Regions:
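C-terminal and inter-domain tail/linker signature
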Residues: 1-171
């Protein structure tokens, strides 16, 4: 299916606001129309190359979080670069995401995108968000300060002390 290009002459900020609206509509075809063919999208956990990979990522995300919503909290445009601080909410209740079965838990995560627009299309995006917070919210990691969290930290610290002792003995 051909990808429609955004209207000519649209500022980078307007293009990004339009893309965020498409995210909330879960309209992957509209998103494809805002991405360059060779887009590079860097998330903390994966780097995606090209429209097809990025589209696949969002299709999987939308299937995993059917009530996905992302709100722009702040947007700064400087020429071809746009910085967006956002808040994502939803429920991890659909299909598995990145190998993680749906937990039924609510999500509320803040993040920042640094997008570069070239020739009227998103050429790259660097995404930053708190992966530990996300993992705790879906139940992949124990809650901060919980018994499970304290046990995991104690086990890790014990391991580090043992490794330090082994290094000392090898000297």
């Amino acid at each position: 299916m051909p990808v429609a290009s955004p209207p000519a002459g649209v500022s980078a900020g307007v293009l990004i606001r339009s893309a965020f609206a498409a995210l909330n509509e879960q309209d992957v075809q509209a998103l494809r129309g805002s991405w360059s063919e060779s887009i590079v999208e860097r998330f903390p956990e994966v780097t995606l190359h090209g429209r097809d990979e990025v589209a696949g990522y969002f299709e999987t995300l939308f299937a995993a979080v059917p009530d996905f919503h992302i709100e722009i909290k702040a947007l700064v445009e400087q020429g071809e670069e746009v910085f967006v601080r956002w808040r994502l909410t939803g429920t991890h209740s659909g299909t598995p995401f990145q190998g993680i079965a749906p937990s039924g838990r609510s999500l509320a995560s803040d993040g920042v995108d640094h997008l570069v627009v070239r020739d009227g299309m998103v050429a790259s995006n660097f995404v930053v968000y708190d992966q530990m917070q996300f993992a705790r919210q879906i139940g992949l990691l124990p809650g901060d300060g919980s018994a499970g969290d304290r046990a995991a930290k104690a086990a890790f610290n014990t391991r580090m002390r043992l490794l330090a002792r082994l290094r000392e003995r090898r000297r």
